[in-house]
Amino acid sequence: MWFATAVFKKKPSMPDSGHENARTGSWGEDVAACFLQNCGWKIVGRRVRPCMRDRRCEIDMIARSPDRQTVVFVEVKTHAARSPRASPLWGVDRRKKNVLLRACASWLMWEKWHGNFRFDVIEVFGRRTSPRPPEIDHFENVPLFPPKWRFW
């Protein structure tokens, strides 16, 4: 099983903060990174902060698709369990989308990337302390960028 071999054998990255939510989010990002790597993706960066003056301006993960032609900005959302009353993408609200749009534009300009790019959301359902492997939903090409959007 990919999860047991990839996540449990390596020491998970922990943020400086001792908050439980930060640890859970970091664990979810570790799980998502292992999932993408096992699908043939290349992780370019994690917890990338392209906007120097805004500490909220963070991209959870930047990856290259298996064909290496597309840069994918990934937002990871970690939940203890699925909720029957909540939409899976409610965690990415208008304010978060605006921050992500600014962060992605900053990264694209900094790297001078003129190729294809998109925005994905990965949701991880599970607990760090649970013996059961987490469930993962990968939503590709979530509409974050306006149609035909270019910044140059």
Where are the model-predicted features located?
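Interdomain/boundary linker segments immediately adjacent to catalytic/signaling cores
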Residues: 1-30, 34
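Non-catalytic C-terminal interaction segments of nucleic acid-processing enzymes
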Residues: 3-7, 122-152
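A short acidic/basic microdomain associated with nuclease active sites
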Residues: 34-54
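Conserved catalytic cores of phosphodiester-cleaving nucleases, focusing on short active-site segments
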Residues: 36, 59-83, 100
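A generic structural motif
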Residues: 49, 64-66, 124-127
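Short, solvent-exposed loop/turn segments that connect beta-strands within catalytic domains
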Residues: 54-55, 66-70, 128-134
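Catalytic cores of nucleic-acid endonucleases
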Residues: 78-129
